[in-house]
Protein backbone atom coordinates (compact mmCIF):
# COMPACT_ATOMS: atom_id res chain seq x y z
CA UNK A 1 0.00 0.00 0.00
CA UNK A 2 2.75 2.48 0.89
CA UNK A 3 6.06 2.64 -0.91
CA UNK A 4 9.21 2.92 1.08
CA UNK A 5 10.73 6.43 1.08
CA UNK A 6 14.08 5.26 -0.28
CA UNK A 7 12.46 3.93 -3.47
CA UNK A 8 10.52 7.16 -4.02
CA UNK A 9 13.65 9.29 -3.67
CA UNK A 10 15.73 7.20 -6.06
CA UNK A 11 13.11 7.32 -8.75
CA UNK A 12 13.44 10.20 -11.26
CA UNK A 13 10.65 12.79 -11.02
CA UNK A 14 8.10 12.67 -13.75
CA UNK A 15 8.10 15.72 -15.99
CA UNK A 16 4.70 17.27 -16.45
CA UNK A 17 3.81 16.81 -20.06
CA UNK A 18 1.39 19.31 -21.40
CA UNK A 19 0.77 21.26 -24.53
CA UNK A 20 3.99 23.06 -25.55
CA UNK A 21 2.56 24.64 -28.64
CA UNK A 22 2.87 28.23 -27.37
CA UNK A 23 6.35 29.75 -27.45
CA UNK A 24 7.65 33.25 -27.02
CA UNK A 25 9.11 35.05 -30.01
CA UNK A 26 12.54 35.11 -28.38
CA UNK A 27 12.49 31.34 -27.89
CA UNK A 28 11.16 30.50 -31.33
CA UNK A 29 13.52 28.41 -33.44
CA UNK A 30 15.57 30.26 -36.02
CA UNK A 31 14.33 30.07 -39.56
CA UNK A 32 15.96 27.24 -41.36
CA UNK A 33 15.90 29.15 -44.65
CA UNK A 34 18.96 31.44 -45.00
CA UNK A 35 18.44 35.03 -46.08
CA UNK A 36 19.47 36.08 -49.54
CA UNK A 37 22.31 38.57 -50.13
CA UNK A 38 19.76 41.08 -51.42
CA UNK A 39 17.83 40.96 -48.16
CA UNK A 40 21.05 41.48 -46.17
CA UNK A 41 22.10 44.41 -48.39
CA UNK A 42 18.70 46.11 -47.98
CA UNK A 43 18.83 45.72 -44.19
CA UNK A 44 22.36 47.15 -43.97
CA UNK A 45 21.40 50.03 -46.30
CA UNK A 46 18.38 50.92 -44.15
CA UNK A 47 20.48 50.83 -40.98
CA UNK A 48 23.19 53.03 -42.52
CA UNK A 49 20.54 55.48 -43.82
CA UNK A 50 18.92 55.74 -40.38
CA UNK A 51 22.29 56.46 -38.74
CA UNK A 52 23.17 59.06 -41.40
CA UNK A 53 19.78 60.79 -40.99
CA UNK A 54 20.14 60.82 -37.21
CA UNK A 55 23.59 62.43 -37.38
CA UNK A 56 22.80 65.07 -40.02
CA UNK A 57 19.17 66.03 -39.39
CA UNK A 58 18.14 69.08 -37.35
CA UNK A 59 15.27 67.06 -35.87
CA UNK A 60 17.64 65.39 -33.40
CA UNK A 61 19.78 68.48 -32.75
CA UNK A 62 20.54 69.41 -29.14
CA UNK A 63 19.39 73.02 -29.46
CA UNK A 64 15.86 73.62 -30.69
CA UNK A 65 15.60 75.75 -33.82
CA UNK A 66 13.00 78.05 -32.19
CA UNK A 67 12.97 78.88 -28.52
CA UNK A 68 11.66 81.77 -26.47
CA UNK A 69 14.66 81.46 -24.15
CA UNK A 70 17.03 82.44 -26.98
CA UNK A 71 15.07 85.65 -27.58
CA UNK A 72 15.15 86.52 -23.86
CA UNK A 73 18.91 85.94 -23.70
CA UNK A 74 19.51 88.25 -26.68
CA UNK A 75 17.54 91.05 -24.99
CA UNK A 76 19.38 90.63 -21.69
CA UNK A 77 22.76 90.57 -23.43
CA UNK A 78 22.24 94.16 -24.58
CA UNK A 79 21.92 95.44 -21.00
CA UNK A 80 25.27 95.99 -19.27
CA UNK A 81 25.88 93.94 -16.14
CA UNK A 82 26.52 95.82 -12.89
CA UNK A 83 30.15 96.11 -11.84
CA UNK A 84 31.64 96.49 -8.40
CA UNK A 85 32.45 100.15 -9.08
CA UNK A 86 28.85 100.90 -10.07
CA UNK A 87 27.43 99.16 -6.99
CA UNK A 88 29.69 100.69 -4.30
CA UNK A 89 28.19 104.23 -4.36
CA UNK A 90 24.66 102.84 -4.18
CA UNK A 91 25.57 100.65 -1.18
CA UNK A 92 27.23 103.57 0.61
CA UNK A 93 24.13 105.71 0.06
CA UNK A 94 21.91 102.96 1.47
CA UNK A 95 24.12 102.59 4.54
CA UNK A 96 24.18 106.33 5.16
CA UNK A 97 20.42 106.64 4.80
CA UNK A 98 19.81 103.60 7.03
CA UNK A 99 22.21 104.75 9.77
CA UNK A 100 20.49 107.14 12.21
CA UNK A 101 22.26 110.48 12.44
CA UNK A 102 23.36 111.13 16.03
CA UNK A 103 22.05 114.23 17.75
CA UNK A 104 24.25 116.50 19.86
CA UNK A 105 22.91 114.85 23.04
CA UNK A 106 23.58 111.30 21.86
CA UNK A 107 27.14 111.98 20.66
CA UNK A 108 28.74 112.41 24.14
CA UNK A 109 27.02 109.27 25.36
CA UNK A 110 28.53 107.23 22.53
CA UNK A 111 32.00 108.67 23.02
CA UNK A 112 32.26 107.36 26.57
CA UNK A 113 34.95 104.67 26.68
CA UNK A 114 33.70 101.18 27.33
CA UNK A 115 35.88 98.79 29.27
CA UNK A 116 36.47 95.30 27.99
CA UNK A 117 34.00 93.96 30.53
CA UNK A 118 31.29 96.54 29.72
CA UNK A 119 27.88 95.22 28.74
CA UNK A 120 26.54 96.37 25.37
CA UNK A 121 23.01 96.27 24.07
CA UNK A 122 22.14 93.70 21.38
CA UNK A 123 21.71 96.44 18.77
CA UNK A 124 25.20 97.80 19.47
CA UNK A 125 26.65 94.31 19.24
CA UNK A 126 24.95 93.72 15.86
CA UNK A 127 26.25 97.04 14.51
CA UNK A 128 29.76 96.26 15.73
CA UNK A 129 29.64 92.79 14.19
CA UNK A 130 28.49 94.26 10.88
CA UNK A 131 31.44 96.64 10.84
CA UNK A 132 34.00 94.10 11.99
CA UNK A 133 33.42 91.14 9.68
CA UNK A 134 36.51 89.15 8.70
CA UNK A 135 35.78 89.35 4.97
CA UNK A 136 33.92 92.02 3.03
CA UNK A 137 32.57 90.41 -0.17
CA UNK A 138 31.71 93.80 -1.66
CA UNK A 139 35.28 95.06 -1.65
CA UNK A 140 37.09 91.72 -1.45
CA UNK A 141 39.14 92.87 1.56
CA UNK A 142 40.02 90.78 4.60
CA UNK A 143 39.89 92.55 7.99
CA UNK A 144 42.81 91.02 9.89
CA UNK A 145 41.88 93.00 13.03
CA UNK A 146 38.47 91.32 13.30
CA UNK A 147 37.94 89.84 16.79
CA UNK A 148 36.39 86.76 15.18
CA UNK A 149 39.87 85.72 13.99
CA UNK A 150 41.00 85.61 17.60
CA UNK A 151 44.19 87.57 17.03
CA UNK A 152 45.67 84.72 14.99
CA UNK A 153 46.79 87.10 12.24
CA UNK A 154 49.07 88.93 14.67
CA UNK A 155 50.29 85.90 16.62
CA UNK A 156 53.49 83.88 16.26
CA UNK A 157 52.12 82.07 13.18
CA UNK A 158 50.58 85.21 11.72
CA UNK A 159 51.94 84.95 8.18
CA UNK A 160 51.04 81.25 7.87
CA UNK A 161 47.55 81.97 9.23
CA UNK A 162 47.06 84.85 6.79
CA UNK A 163 48.05 82.63 3.87
CA UNK A 164 45.74 79.81 5.01
CA UNK A 165 42.78 82.08 5.74
CA UNK A 166 43.20 83.92 2.42
CA UNK A 167 43.26 80.56 0.66
CA UNK A 168 40.02 79.60 2.43
CA UNK A 169 38.26 82.89 1.64
CA UNK A 170 39.11 82.87 -2.06
CA UNK A 171 38.70 79.08 -2.48
CA UNK A 172 36.32 77.88 -5.16
CA UNK A 173 36.75 74.20 -4.29
CA UNK A 174 33.65 72.33 -3.12
CA UNK A 175 33.23 71.86 -0.18
CA UNK A 176 34.62 75.29 0.61
CA UNK A 177 38.31 75.32 1.51
CA UNK A 178 39.17 71.68 0.82
CA UNK A 179 42.32 72.75 -1.01
CA UNK A 180 43.52 74.76 2.05
CA UNK A 181 43.59 72.00 4.68
CA UNK A 182 47.35 71.49 4.44
CA UNK A 183 47.98 75.21 5.02
CA UNK A 184 45.87 75.18 8.19
CA UNK A 185 47.72 72.09 9.46
CA UNK A 186 50.99 74.05 9.25
CA UNK A 187 49.56 76.78 11.49
Curated annotation (Swiss-Prot):
CC terms in the record's Gene Ontology section: mitochondrial inner membrane; mitochondrial intermembrane space
Domain CHCH, residue spans: 154-187
GO biological process: protein import into mitochondrial intermembrane space
Cell compartments where the protein resides: Mitochondrion inner membrane
Topological domain spans for side Mitochondrial intermembrane: 62-187
Cofactor entry: Cu(2+); Zn(2+)
Bilayer topology annotation: Single-pass type II membrane protein
Swiss-Prot/TrEMBL keywords: Disulfide bond, Membrane, Mitochondrion, Mitochondrion inner membrane, Oxidoreductase, Protein transport, Redox-active center, Signal-anchor, Transit peptide, Translocation, Transmembrane, Transmembrane helix, Transport
Cofactor detail note: Cu(2+) or Zn(2+).
Coiled coil: none
Disulphide connectivity of cysteines: 146-148, 167-180
Top-level taxon: Eukaryota
Secretion signal span: none
Targeting presequence: 1-24
Parts of the chain that traverse the membrane: 44-61
One function term, GO molecular function aspect: protein-disulfide reductase activity
Domain notes: The CHCH domain contains a conserved twin Cys-X(9)-Cys motif which is required for import and stability of MIA40 in mitochondria.
Function: Required for the import and folding of small cysteine-containing proteins (small Tim) in the mitochondrial intermembrane space (IMS). Forms a redox cycle with ERV1 that involves a disulfide relay system. Precursor proteins to be imported into the IMS are translocated in their reduced form into the mitochondria. The oxidized form of MIA40 forms a transient intermolecular disulfide bridge with the reduced precursor protein, resulting in oxidation of the precursor protein that now contains an intramolecular disulfide bond and is able to undergo folding in the IMS.
Subunit structure: Monomer.
Stated name of the protein: Mitochondrial intermembrane space import and assembly protein 40
Annotated source species: Aspergillus oryzae (strain ATCC 42149 / RIB 40) (Yellow koji mold)
Gene designation per UniProt: mia40
Amino acid sequence: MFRPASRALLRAPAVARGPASRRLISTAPAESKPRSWKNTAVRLGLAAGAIYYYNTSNVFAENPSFSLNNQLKKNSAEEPLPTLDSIKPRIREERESAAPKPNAEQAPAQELPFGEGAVKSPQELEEEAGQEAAFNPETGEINWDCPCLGGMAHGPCGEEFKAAFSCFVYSEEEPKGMDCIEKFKCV
